């Protein structure tokens, strides 16, 4: 945060959400970027199709992506930094960003003495109204064991206050929480994932519609991205979705509402989006999931 100029060559260690976002941002600002990933693909915890699109865009835009490469050390040099990989290779750059995860700042502040239960990772255990194991103590935000998102933290804070004051509250349902990765293009997700459907955690049908088929996308030159919907095999209810697109964070809201109100794909398809618009791909995908009968 104290940089006075953009790095000439930024080495990013870690290809999770933070690493991918900063790598994308600095490449867009004109920095040479090398992304060191220990996994086979960037964003290993995200939708595989979405991660594939982002990695392809990264490489096409001139970013160097070193997959299956584990960084052993990063040291300062006379001209910048040198990252040494597990196989002995070295990468030289002007700056390095370490994006290899975070830990909650909950140690030695008296939580255990107060009877507040922690997870093995040090996060505070909370229920769906943000209350800890001690009835009069609440926790909100990244220190809790809920989703580490600003929207969730804000909702936890509101829920905790209302609940503590005796007001009626709706318990937080993390399955309905949308999240977004601010790369270019963005990745927005909500609900169940394709991995959970594929491994049998929940039954569902999957449909993916490339954004390149969208009229508005053609008008503005967007070729990368897609809309992917997940629906219950039994009822046709929308249970999840992934959008990879410019401003996907703005496009995901219809799917959030569909999941929150348990709309079917047919009900979603009956909505009238503006034509032409990127949001039209959502109803197009829903329409394609209709089962005749």
What are these regions (language model features)?
Residues 48, 77, 96, 138, ...:
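Residue-level structural signal for beta-strand termini and adjacent loop
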Residues 1-7, 90-166:
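FAD-site-proximal beta/loop scaffold in flavoenzymes
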Residues 20-21, 26, 43, 105-108, ...:
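Glycine/Thr-rich phosphate-binding loops of Rossmann-like dinucleotide-binding domains
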Residues 1-2, 7-11, 17-78, 82, ...:
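Rossmann-like dinucleotide-binding cores of NAD(P)H-dependent redox enzymes
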Residues 78, 120, 233-235:
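Short acidic-glycine loop/turn motifs at beta-strand connectors
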Residues 32, 64, 90, 117, ...:
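Conserved beta-strand segments of alpha/beta enzyme cores
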Residues 36, 84, 118, 126, ...:
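Hydrophobic alpha-helical segments, especially N-terminal targeting/anchoring helices
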Residues 165-166, 177, 182-293:
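Flexible, glycine-rich terminal cap/loop adjacent to redox cofactors
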């Amino acid at each position: 945060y104290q940089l006075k100029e953009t790095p000439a060559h930024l080495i990013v260690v870690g290809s999770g959400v933070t690493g991918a976002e900063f790598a994308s941002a600095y490449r867009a600002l004109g920095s040479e970027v090398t992304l060191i990933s220990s996994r086979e693909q960037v964003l290993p915890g995200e939708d595989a199709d979405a991660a594939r699109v982002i990695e392809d865009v990264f490489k096409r835009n001139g970013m160097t992506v070193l997959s299956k490469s584990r960084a052993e050390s990063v040291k300062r040099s006379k001209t910048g930094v040198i990252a040494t990989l597990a196989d002995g290779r070295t990468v030289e750059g002007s700056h390095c960003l370490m994006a290899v995860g975070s830990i909650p700042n909950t140690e030695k502040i008296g939580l255990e003495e107060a009877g507040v239960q922690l997870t093995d990772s040090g996060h505070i255990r909370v229920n769906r109204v943000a209350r800890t194991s001690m009835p009069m103590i609440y926790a909100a935000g990244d220190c809790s064991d809920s989703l580490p998102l600003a929207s969730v933290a804000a909702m936890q804070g509101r829920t905790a206050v209302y609940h503590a004051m005796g007001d009626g509250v709706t318990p937080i349902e993390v399955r309905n929480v949308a999240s977004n990765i601010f790369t270019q293009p963005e990745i927005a997700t909500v609900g169940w994932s394709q991995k959970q459907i594929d491994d049998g955690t929940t039954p569902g049908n999957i449909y993916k519609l490339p954004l390149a088929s969208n009229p508005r996308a053609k008008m503005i030159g967007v070729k990368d991205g897609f809309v992917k919907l997940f629906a219950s095999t039994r009822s046709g209810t929308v249970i999840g979705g992934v959008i990879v697109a410019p401003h996907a964070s703005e496009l995901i809201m219809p799917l959030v509402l569909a999941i929150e109100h348990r709309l079917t794909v047919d009900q979603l398809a009956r909505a009238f989006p503006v034509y032409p618009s990127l949001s039209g791909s959502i109803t197009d995908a829903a329409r394609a999931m209709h089962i005749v009968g």
